[in-house]
């Protein structure tokens, strides 16, 4: 159903509405964050919306709204990725048709070695950071974001590392989903 | 006052399927290719990409001749003509009420589909529009039948019979729509002393059986007399039984609810919500249902 303003309802597909927030106790020191004013949260919510609009088959739900609210309980690097993976499972559990799983992972470089799934100290170190959201079956990229500068030659290696991590994640998520299906049917 | 019991969370053991299903079910997740054969027509839960039929929800594949569809575990209610639903009024608009029925879009109850008090048959005038709020307000529960479905999936309801209308005192249980079995009638008077309406949309309404069966008002006047304690106990027990059946994923219909109620009689009403007691009751119910099937 459409909640909030009716005028934003799209006639031929569903609107995906995402909200992203960090709990106060999620990082090392407890910080009280403004409820919705945080710019980083707004940006990550927009990224979530873009990734899921690419994955959910929205044309099957005209004039409706799909809400995805993500709250991070423990932040240790890769917040957005954890949010994407959790939201994928949530959307699948709700029975909303999707093209494929959306698996996300960060990748970076430390002195020529590509690293996958960076932790918070590694992210804070200031090196280049690549965030990749992938649809594993077809290999289509839903979102690709790079912060800090990266040499063009190193891009391939980092992308490959992130892709591998995403595919490994897909295997884990898939196993969980199938176990649950087997349990219930 | 009884003390509060607390317990630590423990992984749930699902009661496994007792009867072996005929054949292995083909379980899929989004992104899995179901078949590359172009001879099949695609149904719900699938989409076509580059001549491959790919699943879009996580569930079991159902094949009917040439039609392939994937049935998901948990979906919103999809209205079908002739279904009984129980819904809650969310909005009062110009000539209609918007009813929430656990579906993708709010269902619509048009003023012309509603019986006037007194059972008159006349064209609805402007005064009727202004008096809409006297009949049904936001937050009221109604039982209705689906008359038709709009192109975007919203259902249009009607209460054109005396058995539909505003619901009075009782208990609502919300379950997944896939657990309510399709039957000839969804209004049941259980012999234990309460009545139950099994809405196809997953809303189940339990209420005390009315003594006199003739109501000329068409279900508008709500009976606000105090309900006796014995009836309340029966209703609470039924509600806990339904919750127990739902957690073990058993189909809901009048016989299963009745057997579950009888199996739960030796326990106290509040004990039914404990996991071990729930498992025991549901096992017994399942056993009796299997015996019934023969």
Residue locations for each model-derived region?
Chain A
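Polyanion-binding surfaces on beta-sheet-dominated domains and ring/shell assemblies
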Residues: 1-185
């Amino acid at each position: 159903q459409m909640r909030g303003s009716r005028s934003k309802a799209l006639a031929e597909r569903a609107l995906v509405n995402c909200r992203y927030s960090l709990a106060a106790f999620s990082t090392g020191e407890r910080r009280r964050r403004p409820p919705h004013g945080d710019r980083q949260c707004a940006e990550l919510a927009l990224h979530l919306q873009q990734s899921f609009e690419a994955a959910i088959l929205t044309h099957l739900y005209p004039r409706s709204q799909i809400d995805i609210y993500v709250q991070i309980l423990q932040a240790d690097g890769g917040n957005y990725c954890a949010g994407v993976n959790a939201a994928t499972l949530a959307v699948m559990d709700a029975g909303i048709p999707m093209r494929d799983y959306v698996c996300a992972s960060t990748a970076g470089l430390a002195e020529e070695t590509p690293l996958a799934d960076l932790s918070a100290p590694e992210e804070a170190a200031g090196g280049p950071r690549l965030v990749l959201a992938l649809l594993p079956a077809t290999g289509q990229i839903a979102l690709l974001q790079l912060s800090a500068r990266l040499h063009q030659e190193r891009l391939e290696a980092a992308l490959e590392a992130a892709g591998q991590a995403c595919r490994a994640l897909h295997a884990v998520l898939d196993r969980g989903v199938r176990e649950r299906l087997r349990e219930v049917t | 006052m009884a003390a509060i019991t607390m317990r630590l969370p423990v992984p749930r053991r699902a009661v496994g399927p007792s009867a072996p299903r005929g054949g292995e079910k083909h379980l899929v997740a989004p992104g899995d290719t179901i078949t590359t054969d172009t001879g099949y027509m695609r149904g719900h839960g699938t989409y076509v990409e580059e001549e491959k039929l790919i699943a879009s929800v996580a569930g079991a594949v159902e094949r009917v001749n040439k039609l392939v569809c994937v049935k998901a575990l948990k979906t919103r209610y999809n209205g079908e003509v002739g279904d009984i639903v129980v819904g809650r009024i969310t909005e009062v608009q110009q000539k209609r009420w918007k009813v929430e029925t656990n579906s993708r879009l709010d269902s619509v109850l048009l003023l012309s589909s509603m019986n006037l008090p007194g059972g008159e048959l006349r064209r609805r005038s402007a005064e009727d529009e202004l008096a809409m709020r006297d009949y049904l307000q936001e937050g009221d529960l109604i039982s209705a039948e689906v008359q038709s479905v709009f192109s975007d999936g919203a259902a249009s309801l009607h209460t054109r019979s005396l058995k539909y209308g505003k619901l009075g005192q009782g208990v609502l249980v919300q379950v997944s729509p896939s657990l309510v079995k399709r039957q000839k009638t969804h209004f049941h008077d259980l012999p234990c002393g309460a009545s139950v309406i099994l809405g196809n949309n997953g809303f189940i309404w339990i209420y005390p059986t009315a003594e006199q069966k003739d109501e000329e008002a068409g279900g508008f006047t709500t009976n606000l007399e105090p309900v006796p304690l014995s009836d309340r106990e029966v209703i609470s027990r039924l509600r806990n039984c339904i919750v127990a059946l739902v957690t073990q994923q058993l189909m809901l219909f009048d016989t299963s609810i009745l057997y579950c109620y009888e199996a739960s009689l030796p326990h106290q009403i509040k004990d039914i919500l404990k996991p071990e007691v729930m498992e025991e009751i549901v096992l017994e119910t399942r056993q009796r249902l299997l015996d019934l099937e023969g």
